[in-house]
UniProtKB/Swiss-Prot annotation:
Native organism taxonomy: Eukaryota, Metazoa, Chordata, Craniata, Vertebrata
Record PROSITE patterns: PROTEIN_KINASE_ATP, PROTEIN_KINASE_DOM, PROTEIN_KINASE_ST
Residues the record lists as Phosphoserine modifications: 156, 313
Protein name: Cyclin-dependent kinase 7
Domain Protein kinase intervals: 4-287
Natural source organism: Rattus norvegicus
Chief location category: nucleus
Family that this chain belongs to: Belongs to the protein kinase superfamily. CMGC Ser/Thr protein kinase family. CDC2/CDKX subfamily.
GO terms for MF: ATP binding; ATP-dependent activity, acting on DNA; cyclin-dependent protein serine/threonine kinase activity; kinase activity; protein kinase activity; protein serine kinase activity; protein-containing complex binding; RNA polymerase II CTD heptapeptide repeat kinase activity
Length: 329
C-alpha cells in the first residue's frame, strides 16, 4: 500500500472511495478504489462481497474497452483495488456544454462501448449497471467499461437474479416489472438510453420512481402490446398501463439518419428476446456507413476539471470531498 502516493480525491460511491495516486515504483498514475467495510452480514471472510466479485471478474478480463485491474491488496476487512487512471467519463463529456459532439464522436463512443460489452457478453458476464459515468475515458480517448460491482455471470441457468440493478434511468422495462431472470437485454437497453443521452445531451428517461420510469418509457416509446412482448403480463410486478401511442423516434432524434434510428429502435425493443445484441449492433449499417468514428486522440476532452463539473451539478460532492480529505489527515 505504501508504494502508492495519494494525489487527489476523485469521488465516493455507496461502497467505495476513489483516489488518484502515483505508483512510486513505476511512476504510473493510478486510481485506487478503497472498498468500504460492509456490515457484519456482508463481510464475508472480512471482505465485502461486492469487492470480491469485482476482483474475480476483472482479473479474468482483458480487452482494450474494459478497465484494467492492476493490483488488489487489503488487510483485515479492508480492500483496495488499483486500476488504470482514467481522465474523465462520458457523463462529464455529455454535461460539458462547451463541447460539441459530432455524429462521428457519438459513433466512436458507441463503437467502443459495444466492443467492450460484446466481449463481456461473450464471456457470459452481464454488466448490469451501465450509465454514462461508468464509461470512463483515458487521455488517448479510449473508452473503457468500469464499475463491475454489480456484474454477474449469466451462464448458470435458472439463476434468480435480483431485479434491483441498474440506475433507474437506464433500467430495462423487464427489470422494472420485477423480472428475476434476464439476460444481455438489460445491458442493451441501458446502451440505448446512453446513446439517446449522447444525442440529446440530457438524460432520456429520467424517472423519479419505478412507476414513473415505466410511465415515461411507455409515453415516449408507446405501450407494448401482448404481440410485441408476449411474456410481459407474467412478470412478477406487472401492472397494466394506459395505452400510449408513443412518439416516432425521428421526431425525438431529429438529426439522426435512418441507420442510426434503426439501431435505436433495435435497442429499445420491448421484448428482451428480440432486442438487439452487442454483436448484432456492431454489424448494423450505422457502423459501416459514413461518417466513420473519430479516432480516440481526436475526441473532445473536458474543458474544465472533472471534479469542478461534478461539484457544480452536485454540491454534496464538494462537501464529501472536503470531509474525506479531513478524515485522511
Amino acid at each position: 500500500a505504501n508504494r502508492n502516493e495519494k494525489l487527489d480525491f476523485l469521488g465516493e460511491g455507496q461502497f467505495a472511495t476513489v483516489y488518484k495516486a502515483r505508483d512510486k515504483n513505476t511512476n504510473q498514475i493510478v486510481a485506487i478504489k478503497k472498498i468500504k467495510l460492509g456490515h457484519r452480514s456482508e463481510a464475508k471472510d472480512g471482505i465485502n462481497r461486492t469487492a470480491l466479485r469485482e476482483i474475480k471478474l476483472l482479473q479474468e478480463l482483458s480487452h482494450p474497452n474494459i478497465i484494467g485491474l492492476l493490483d488488489a491488496f487489503g488487510h483485515k476487512s479492508n480492500i483496495s483495488l488499483v486500476f488504470d487512471f482514467m481522465e474523465t467519463d462520458l457523463e462529464v463529456i455529455i454535461k460539458d456544454n462547451s463541447l460539441v459532439l459530432t455524429p462521428s464522436h457519438i459513433k466512436a463512443y458507441m463503437l467502443m462501448t459495444l466492443q467492450g460489452l460484446e466481449y463481456l457478453h461473450q464471456h457470459w458476464i452481464l454488466h448490469r449497471d451501465l450509465k454514462p459515468n461508468n464509461l470512463l475515458l483515458d487521455e488517448n480517448g479510449v473508452l473503457k467499461l468500469a464499475d463491475f460491482g454489480l456484474a454477474k455471470s449469466f451462464g448458470s441457468p435458472n439463476w434468480a437474479y435480483t431485479h434491483q440493478v441498474v440506475t433507474r434511468w437506464y433500467r430495462a422495462p423487464e427489470l422494472l416489472f420485477g423480472a428475476r431472470m434476464y439476460g444481455v437485454g438489460v445491458d442493451m437497453w441501458a446502451v440505448g438510453c446512453i446513446l439517446a443521452e449522447l444525442l440529446l445531451r440530457v438524460p432520456f428517461l429520467p424517472g423519479d420512481s419505478d412507476l414513473d420510469q415505466l410511465t415515461r418509457i411507455f409515453e415516449t416509446l408507446g405501450t407494448p402490446t401482448e404481440e410485441q412482448w408476449p411474456d410481459m403480463c407474467s412478470l412478477p410486478d406487472y401492472v397494466t398501463f394506459k395505452s400510449f401511442p408513443g412518439i416516432p423516434l425521428q421526431h425525438i432524434f431529429i438529426a439522426a439518419g435512418d441507420d442510426l434510428l434503426e439501431l435505436i429502435q433495435g435497442l429499445f425493443l420491448f421484448n428482451p428476446c428480440t432486442r438487439i445484441t452487442a454483436s448484432q449492433a456492431l454489424r448494423t449499417k450505422y457502423f459501416s456507413n459514413r461518417p466513420g468514428p473519430t479516432p480516440g486522440c481526436q475526441l473532445p476532452r473536458p474543458n474544465c476539471p472533472v471534479e469542478a463539473l461534478k461539484e457544480q451539478s452536485n454540491p454534496a460532492m464538494a462537501t464529501k470531498r472536503k470531509r474525506a480529505e479531513a478524515l485522511e489527515q
